Amino acid sequence: MFKKIITPRISETNITGHIGHTVIPVWLEEGYEEIILLFSRNLAEPSLITVNMNMDFLHEIFFGKDVEILTSVKKIGTSSFVLHQEGYQDGKPCVRASTTLVHFDYSTHKPDPIPKTFLDILNEHLSVSS
């Protein structure tokens, strides 16, 4: 499991005083940044694309208190994998998300099988309870 602490910025609040819903996908992507870097040490040559992201907003998130993003691998396929993410503020679940990433060959514009070395790493973070 990967853990990332996000410190909300005042600019991320909306008129109702809590963090805007458009901010959360950015935070979730920060939560799986380590996974992106495993596949693409050189960000000028990416090898993953996001093909799906679903979020459930469970509770408002407020400025002034850190948010913990937990990321685990939910499912692994031949050329894709699904991440499960949860965001907590003060120990309270605030957001739950599922994101599908595809190992992608930009030269052919087609999915590419995930190399065994990366499969092994993903399997280390596979969660049976997600």
Predicted regions and their residues:
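HotDog/MaoC-like acyl-thioester-processing domains
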Residues: 1-4, 62-63, 74-130
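Hot-dog-fold acyl-thioester-processing enzymes
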Residues: 1-52, 106-130
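Hydrophobic beta-strand-centered segment that forms part of the acyl-chain substrate-binding groove
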Residues: 35-80, 95-96, 102
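Preference for bulky hydrophobic residues occupying beta-strand positions
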Residues: 6-8, 55, 71, 85
